[in-house]
Amino acid sequence: MCDQFVGTWKFLSSENFEDYMKELGVGFATRKMAGVAKPNVTISINGDVITIKTESTFKNTEVSFRLGEEFDETTADDRKTKNVITLDNGILNQVQKWDGKETVIKRKVMDGNLVVECTMNTVTSKRVYERA
């Protein structure tokens, strides 16, 4: 199912993350702090519950969910969001909605790395993590 995602992932690189955060409406100071953070991501599965834990010097977050079921998440920048994550062709697709807005976060394993693509409107950011 999602076994290829399980493990701890160490931040490797980031493209266009500040522009993506700006598109989300994240304030200047928070963008600057988040932009220099190098988070580790740990993904685990217990039965049919998937947990994604993100830890950095900026903020720690943790979310647990079942594929296809809506869940609430308070993001690292304090947005209160409604989310659904599905698995499509080996890609974890997360649709995140709040205040009439929507962003899509796609997680996939490519060449042994975790690649996270975040898109809102026409702005896309790509963050890459390697196995720790």
From Swiss-Prot:
Q: Where in the cell is the protein located?
A: Cytoplasm; Nucleus
What function does the entry list?
A: Lipid transport protein in adipocytes. Binds both long chain fatty acids and retinoic acid. Delivers long-chain fatty acids and retinoic acid to their cognate receptors in the nucleus. Has the highest binding affinity for linoleic acid and decreasing relative affinity for eicosapentaenoic acid (EPA), alpha-linolenic acid (ALA), docosahexaenoic acid (DHA), oleic acid, palmitic acid and stearic acid, respectively.
> What family is this protein classified in?
Belongs to the calycin superfamily. Fatty-acid binding protein (FABP) family.
Motif Nuclear localization signal location, chain numbering = 22-32
Where is it found, in Gene Ontology cellular component terms?
Answer: cytoplasm; nucleus
Key word Cytoplasm present: yes
Keyword check for Nucleus, yes or no.
yes
For this chain, one GO molecular function annotation is:
long-chain fatty acid transmembrane transporter activity
Q: Which Pfam families match?
A: Lipocalin
What PANTHER family is this protein classified in? FATTY ACID BINDING PROTEIN (PTHR11955)
Query: For (9Z,12Z)-octadecadienoate, which residues are the binding ones?
Result: 107, 127
Provide the gene name from the record: FABP4
| Span of the signal peptide | none
User: What does the domain comment read?
Assistant: Forms a beta-barrel structure that accommodates the hydrophobic ligand in its interior.
Full protein name: Fatty acid-binding protein, adipocyte
**GO annotation (BP), single:** cellular response to linoleic acid
This protein's UniProt keywords: Cytoplasm, Lipid-binding, Nucleus, Transport
Record's subunit section: Monomer.
